[in-house]
């Protein structure tokens, strides 16, 4: 009985020594296991497809949260792509979907509307369109450039604005062609001469 007890005590001694060495090598103030996972960059507010009437004011919101906690450079841009509607058939462009790319799509008729730059980890910018017109219809893109890891990363979301005629819009109909001019009335001289001839014939 003494030998097995001695072996068990020896095993417990080595186990205690191992645990003490493990605790000594761990930095003070840290938990035994660090399960922290850094957050991913994402849009916290995205624009949505909408329909407006001519003359109404339209507002689109876009907010972005970066992937790092320390401050870094963020840039948000609003772009207008004229009548670019083929993206609506792509599921990758869901309203809350995030797309990261190193290069922007080329070959599209796009116009930059506004730019806002901040130093931080969050950025937001609202696009306001006053008294929209049918020519304002099209795709609006919110693009964010994220410099959190030292290089530019591009993220963007899109929404389509449809503009319908307003309630007070005047319907312009095609003009009717001008009527043909009426024939001129007969001259008085001819009528008098005809009457005088008739009177002479009666007298004969």
Swiss-Prot record:
Domain Ig-like: 41-158
Ranges of biased composition (kind: Pro residues): 175-187
Origin: domain of life: Eukaryota
Key words, A-Z: Disulfide bond, Immunoglobulin domain, Signal
Ranges for region Disordered: 168-204
Compositionally biased tracts (Basic and acidic residues): 188-198
Presence of the UniProt keyword Disulfide bond in the record: yes
Biological process, per Gene Ontology: negative regulation of neuron apoptotic process
N-terminal signal peptide: 1-24
Cysteines joined through disulfide linkages: 62-142
Pfam family, one: V-set
Record InterPro entries: Ig-like_dom, Ig-like_dom_sf, Ig-like_fold, Ig_sub, Ig_V-set, IgSF_V-set/TM_domain
One GO cellular component term: membrane
Name under which the protein is recorded: V-set and transmembrane domain-containing protein 2-like protein
Gene source species: Homo sapiens
């Amino acid at each position: 009985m003494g030998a097995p007890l001695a072996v068990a005590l020896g095993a417990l001694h080595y186990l205690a020594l191992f645990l003490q060495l493990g605790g000594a090598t761990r930095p003070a103030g840290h938990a035994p296991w660090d399960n922290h996972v850094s957050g991913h960059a994402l849009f916290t507010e995205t624009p949505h497809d909408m329909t407006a009437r001519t003359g109404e004011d339209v507002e689109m919101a876009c907010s972005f949260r970066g992937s790092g906690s320390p401050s870094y450079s963020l840039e948000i841009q609003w772009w207008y792509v004229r009548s670019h509607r083929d993206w609506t058939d792509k599921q990758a462009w869901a309203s809350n979907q995030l797309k990261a790319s190193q290069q922007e799509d080329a070959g599209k008729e796009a116009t930059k509307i506004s730019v806002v730059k901040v130093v931080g980890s969050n950025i937001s910018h609202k696009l306001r369109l006053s008294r929209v017109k049918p020519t304002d219809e099209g795709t609006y893109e919110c693009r964010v450039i994220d410099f959190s890891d030292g290089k530019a990363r591009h993220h963007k979301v899109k929404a389509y604005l449809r503009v319908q005629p307003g309630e007070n819009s005047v319907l312009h109909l095609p003009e009717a062609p001008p009527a043909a001019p009426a024939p001129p009335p007969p001259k008085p001289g001819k009528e008098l001469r005809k009457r005088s001839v008739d009177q002479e014939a009666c007298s004969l």
